[in-house]
Amino acid sequence: MAHKSIVIFSVLAVLCHSASVKVPPIVDSSLPVKFSEVIAEPAPNVPSNLASYAYALDIYVQTTLSQLQCIKQAGYCAVFVRAYNPAGQGSFDTSSCVTIQNAYKAGLGIEIYMTPQPVSNKQGYQQLDEIIQGLTARAITVRAIWIQVTSPTNWPNNANSNINFINSIVSRARQSGLTVGIYTSYYDWNQITTGWSNIGNDVLLWYWNVYSGGVTGETPANFNDFRKFGCWTAPSVKQFAQDETVCGITVNRDVYLAGNVLKAVEEDGKIYAGGFVQGSLKI
């Protein structure tokens, strides 16, 4: 009888412990691995006395018009919308169309980024083609593309293969008349490409630097911590915060040089998105 009591108490203890454990929400797998289990918390307010920098958000979930209007009212000037989902073999993210259309209606600047799938049976340029075709079919014309090159564990352990994959996307973007940017960090770029420096001086840089996910892991919202790597001597955008909530959605926060982003425009019934971040701060 004593043995049975011990077993019962043990089971109850396990159940009680399980019930008290907080399970973190699912966070997008394209985020840096070490921050993938951070529970998002509300972001601080955007400063009202900005001079050199403007604030933006990068978003990977479908976002409503009311949420984007809230984002605009909160002091953000632009959104970076993910248009390619790396899950499986990778695919065009159809939900990005709704977010882009709503961002246009909210009066926000719009940039498009892709999280490619480097181990897919599709070449890099084919993945970009999917984005262009998918957005064009919905009356959205792409003028620029940002390519996410982060999380080295998601890439093959072969720098030459990775360089060829990235170059495939960059070359196709140039052929399509698009401005090209890379979203990466000093560490990621060196791990994935061993510091490839021949990507081209026309390619813009959006770098990330955070201490950890959440508000306490933010770095200063400026470019002062930038150090040269690859071919880049200056950045265009910095992601300084990850896994925070703004207007009820989980986002990452960014800054860029004030005055470099305009609203998306509509001509001939089409929305033209991307190509608004153009300049860089020479350091």
Curated annotation (Swiss-Prot):
One of its GO terms (molecular function) is lysozyme activity. The keyword Signal applies. CDD domains: GH25_Lys1-like (cd06416). Residues 1-18 form the signal peptide. One of its GO terms (biological process) is defense response to Gram-negative bacterium. Induction: Induced by Gram-negative bacterium S.marcescens infection. Induced by Gram-positive bacterium M.nematophilum infection. Transiently induced by Gram-negative bacteria S.boydii and S.flexneri. Down-regulated by exposure to Gram-positive bacterium B.thuringiensis spore toxins. Down-regulated by exposure to Gram-negative bacteria S.marcescens or P.aeruginosa infection. Down-regulated by Gram-positive bacterium S.aureus infection in the anterior part of the intestine. Keywords: Antimicrobial, Immunity, Innate immunity, Signal. Disruption phenotype: Increased abl-1, fat-5, clec-60 and rga-6 mRNA levels. Reduced survival in response to fungus C.neoformans infection. Reduced survival in response to bacterium B.thuringiensis infection. Increased survival in response to bacterium S.typhimurium infection. Susceptibility to S.typhimurium infection is abolished in an abl-1 (ok171) mutant background. Compared to wild-type, mutants grown in presence of bacterium M.nematophilum are more constipated, the tail swelling is increased, growth is slower and they are arrested at the L3 larval stage. PANTHER family: GLYCOSIDE HYDROLASE FAMILY 25 PROTEIN-RELATED, LYSOZYME PROTEIN. Plays a role in resistance to Gram-positive bacteria B.thuringiensis and M.nematophilum and Gram-negative bacteria S.boydii or S.flexneri infection and to fungus C.neoformans infection. Plays a role in susceptibility to Gram-negative bacterium S.typhimurium infection. This is Lysozyme-like protein 7.
